Swiss-Prot record:
Organism: Glycine max
Subunit structure of this chain's protein: Homodimer.
Listed cofactors: FAD; heme; Mo-molybdopterin
One GO BP annotation of this record: nitric oxide biosynthetic process
Record EC number: 1.7.1.1
GO molecular function ontology, one term from the record: FAD binding
UniProt catalytic activity: nitrite + NAD(+) + H2O = nitrate + NADH + H(+)
Binding site for heme: H548, H571
Amino-acid positions noted as binding FAD in the UniProt annotation, renumbered to this chain: 682-685, 699-704, 711, 716-718, 769
Name this protein carries in UniProt: Inducible nitrate reductase [NADH] 1
Cofactor: how and how many bound: Binds 1 FAD. Binds 1 heme group. The heme group is called cytochrome b-557.
InterPro entries in the record: Cbr1-like_FAD-bd_dom, Cyt_B5-like_heme/steroid-bd, Cyt_B5-like_heme/steroid_sf, Cyt_B5_heme-BS, FAD-bd_FR_type, Flavoprot_Pyr_Nucl_cyt_Rdtase, FNR_nucleotide-bd, Ig_E-set
Ligand binding (Mo-molybdopterin): C165
Length: 886
């Protein structure tokens, strides 16, 4: 590059064009400030001019951010975002990274809209003029600083710094073994120019106390209300000596790339701690507290740790590993990534390409201010290494520290690539730290910095022409693709198939495996042919439809789609092993066609053209029901009522007030939320009538942590629902279920008609809700004469859901009989059964077995297996044909 980027202190910011947002960012500094700079004015002006040029170039080449339809109905629907961002956690909260080729196209400075985003909850909606930052704790003068006061009364520093999430490259971890984090790719880092006021100046102004008086840590707290730990703010801390160290360049930043911070990046003010992981740089900064101990936030202890490989989440909770200080992450480690060749790039092998060198390129960074001093590439698995050329635009600060990534490149012969099985890269820093050859797994999937490997395979892109196709280890988020995903599943199959074992070790494409395009898979979306995609593999589940314990709908609602995230969210390890029996091939993407265009998209690291996803016109058909099979719909929490200490009635609004839900009687829905960075899906049956317009109701029992010894963490979904504020939005998917009541004694079971004049309805715990729904539908139709006999089992009286409604209906309608069974009575005067469901209870309270009698049941599997089914059989019920299990 023509110049280097310096790390200096400036009196006015480097970019004269600032978007209008209220404050004046060109405020001159008081003349008595020590600018703490060792450079002369000429050098300073040259550096500022160069930074301005880089920022203007980055901003000019980025399309405008827009309101994203994926945010509609969420608390973030007011925030413009770049449409190319790869999202990790569904609709909300927003977490994502920019496409890696686009980051490399922009180079040293990343446009703010393409910088990675890590949010734990909704983005606070903040006004500049109303915002204050409190500094308190072990200081002589606790103070609230307005934004204007911060800007006017302290010196400003402006410098470039690379921020990286500690989870960068985590998806590689998740391919080895699932961590508790979502799937970061290799674009979880980027460089911006940050402007703010030094933290040490603010702390000095407030009179920070000495270490001997207990001032050991400086904690930072954000503004957002989060569910973690039963409800908390995002907070973390650093040691006092770090906070006060002038060489660390720690600032309270209010500008990024010459503009005010974007909402996703912490507007109006955030922490910037160069050389540290992004998790220490609190956004929407609200409080700074000087303390004797580390920050006590849930997120300080339960995030950003590297625990030993044998420690899983359960062991970490049981033995307190989260609280051991030696495992906390602060400074970044050394890391490097190959960006050219990009994933699925094809290099044709012909007389022209073989006469020119191929340039392999990428980025590298280290932490703690350590300079990257060497990057090496190997084509033979580490036998020999080629030293790369480094492009380091940054100058060190006055203390010799480097805060930014650098770029590297090396030229290789194309014929050498043709004979290589893979390309791997490793970097070194000035402390002679380097990257390990193999991945070291940890439960949070943090700090992955093993050699970055790109596999090479021979392909025939067009008319017999030979080419090399390059494959990165993973693709970010829930995108399919990457050699690690393929090898993970091939290795499972190879245990019983020696042919597959051989193909895993081959440097060439596995041509024995059938491949399918996405368009081919989409056509198999019905009961006659139900295909799904999981981790890039195609499975035909048609023959499993009738055996699926959750009913055919749970497969059909995802048929013809990539359902990786949902499959992982709701299936056990046993189910994942069963999946292999149904694998029929791999998902492929359409290769480059050398005759289709005059442009060459592949060859020598060209980055002058970045293909963007075409904009398609979407015409939304008018509809009267909310639920759309295979799609998630956003629903807003309208009200929440506490029925008891652990039972809640939730009312959710449908996307439009005039819509019916579109859920048949007997069917259920999935609620989809993201909790602790993982998708959580649970099935619920609404208690509201299917005829209600604009909303639906759920009665939910909240399973709190620490109550039941077998489930010390409680219920993930129920606790999350209980923590939601009014106005929160979650996703709903459905309808699901194999049983549908169509009225007047008629059912459809797996699509086949059934009829009954009498129903034995056996429920346990929260399994009452589908029974309740059928009862409600029958009673609403005065011409439906179906007899209903409900036996409802619970632990105690307090656990009985919907008792008032059931009792009222039983008094009003002769065709409904209700009987309760509880394990133990906690009050005198209980007039129903105590114990478990027995033959004698059923003999007395349900109808005799007959051809026109059906038994319906829903509840815990042990209840159905050991109480309901055997006792019905004793009474002569044909449980194979006349017992319907929701």
């Amino acid at each position: 590059m023509a110049a280097s980027v310096d790390n200096r202190q400036y009196g006015t910011h480097i970019n004269a064009v600032v978007r209008a947002c209220g404050p004046d960012f060109n405020t001159p500094l008081p003349s008595d400030f020590d600018l703490d700079s060792s450079s002369d004015d000429e050098d300073q002006n040259d550096d500022a001019s160069f930074l301005k040029e880089l920022i203007q170039k980055a901003n000019a080449e980025t399309e405008a951010s827009l309101l994203d339809p994926r945010d509609e109905g969420t608390a973030d629907q007011w925030i413009p975002r770049n449409a190319s961002m790869v999202r990790f956690t569904g609709k909300h909260p927003f977490n994502g990274e920019g496409p890696l080729p686009r980051l490399m196209h922009h180079g040293f400075i990343t446009p703010s809209p393409l910088r990675y985003v890590r949010n734990h909850g909704p983005v606070p909606k903040i006004k500049w003029d109303e915002w204050t930052v409190e500094v308190t704790g072990l200081v002589k003068r606790s103070t609230h600083f307005t934004m204007e006061k911060l800007m006017r009364e302290f010196p400003h520093r402006e410098f470039p710094a690379t921020l990286v999430c500690a989870g960068n490259r985590r998806k590689e971890h998740n391919m080895v073994k699932q961590s508790i984090g979502f799937n970061w790719g290799a674009a979880g880092g980027s460089t911006s120019v940050w402007r703010g006021v030094p933290l040490r100046h603010v702390l000095k102004r407030c009179g920070i106390l000495a270490r001997m008086k207990g001032a050991m840590y400086v904690s930072f707290e954000g503004a957002e209300d989060l569910p973690g730990g039963g409800g908390s703010k995002y907070g973390t801390s650093v040691k006092r000596e770090m906070a006060m160290d002038p060489s660390r360049d720690i600032i309270l930043a209010f500008m990024q790339n010459g503009e005010p911070l974007a909402p996703d990046h912490g507007f109006p003010v955030r922490m910037i701690i160069p050389g540290f992981i992004g998790g220490r740089m609190v956004k929407w900064l609200k409080r700074i507290v000087v303390t004797e101990h580390e920050c006590d936030s849930h997120y300080h202890y339960k995030d950003n740790r590297v625990l030993p490989s044998h420690v899983d989440a359960e062991l970490a909770n049981d033995e307190g590993w989260w609280y051991k200080p030696e495992y906390i992450i602060n400074e970044l480690n050394i890391n490097s990534v190959i960006t050219t060749p990009c994933h699925e790039e094809i290099l044709p092998i012909n007389s022209w390409t073989t006469q020119m060198p191929y340039f392999i390129r990428g980025y590298a960074y280290s932490g703690g201010g350590r300079k990257v001093t060497r990057v090496e590439v190997t084509l033979d698995g580490g036998g020999t290494w080629q030293v790369c050329t480094l492009d380091c635009p940054e100058k060190p600060n006055k203390y010799g520290k480097y805060w930014c990534w650098c770029f590297w490149s090396v030229e290789v012969e194309v014929l050498d690539l043709l004979g290589a099985r893979e390309i791997a890269v490793r970097a070194w820093d000035e402390a002679l730290n380097t990257q390990p050859e193999k991945l070291i797994w940890n439960v949070m999937g943090m700090m992955n910095n093993c050699w970055f490997r790109v596999k090479t395979n021979v392909c025939r892109p067009h008319k017999g022409e030979i080419g090399i196709v390059f494959e990165h280890p993973t693709q970010p988020g829930n995108q399919s693709g990457g050699w690690m995903a393929k090898e993970k599943h091939l290795e499972k199959s190879s245990e019983s198939n020696p042919t597959l074992k051989k193909s895993v070790s081959s440097p060439f494409m596995n041509t024995t495996s059938k491949t399918y395009t996405m368009s081919e898979v989409r056509r198999h979306n019905n009961a006659d042919s139900a295909w799904i995609i999981v981790h890039g593999h195609v499975y035909d589940w048609t023959r499993f439809l009738k055996d699926h314990p959750g009913g055919t709908d749970r497969i059909l609602i995802n048929a013809g789609t990539d359902c990786t995230e949902e499959f992982e969210a709701i299936h056990s390890d046993k189910a994942k092993q069963m999946l292999e029996d149904y694998r029929i091939g791999e998902l492929t993407t359409t290769c480059y066609n050398s005759d289709s265009s005059s442009s060459n998209p592949s060859v020598h690291g060209r980055s002058d053209t970045i293909p963007l996803t075409p904009i398609k016109e979407v015409i939304t058909p008018m509809r009267s029901v909310a639920l759309i099979p295979r799609e998630k719909i956003p629903c807003k929490l309208i009200s929440k009522t506490s029925i008891s200490h652990d039972v809640r009635l939730f009312r959710f609004g449908l996307p439009s007030d005039g819509l019916l839900m579109g859920l048949a009687v007997g069917k259920h829905i999935f609620l989809c939320v993201t909790v602790d960075e993982k998708l959580c899906m649970r099935a619920y049956t609404p208690t509201s009538s299917v005829h209600e317009v604009g909303y639906f109701d759920l009665v939910v029992k909240v399973y709190f942590k620490g109550v039941h010894p077998k489930f010390p963490n409680g219920g993930i979904m129920s606790q999350h629902l209980d923590s939601l504020p009014i106005g929160s939005v979650l996703d709903v998917k459905g309808p699901l279920g194999h049983i549908e009541y169509t009225g007047r004694g008629n059912f459809l079971v797996h699509g086949k008609p059934r009829f009954a004049t009498r129903l034995a309805m056996l429920a346990g715990g929260t399994g009452i809700t589908p029974i309740y729904q059928v009862v409600q539908a029958i009673l609403k139709d005065p011409e439906d004469c179906t007899e209903m006999h409900v036996v409802y089992a619970n632990r105690t009286e307090d656990d009985i859901l919907l008792k008032e409604e059931l009792d009222e209906w039983a008094k009003k309608y002769d065709r409904l009989k209700v009987w309760y069974v509880i394990q133990e009575s906690i009050r005198e005067g209980w007039e129903y059964s105590v114990g478990f469901i027995t033959e004698s209870i059923l003999t007395e309270h349900i109808p005799n077995a007959s051809p026109d009698t059906l038994a319906l049941t829903c509840g815990p599997p042990p209840m159905i297996q050991f109480a309901v089914q055997p006792n019905l059989e004793k009474l002569g019920y044909d449980t194979q044909n006349n017992l319907l299990v929701f």
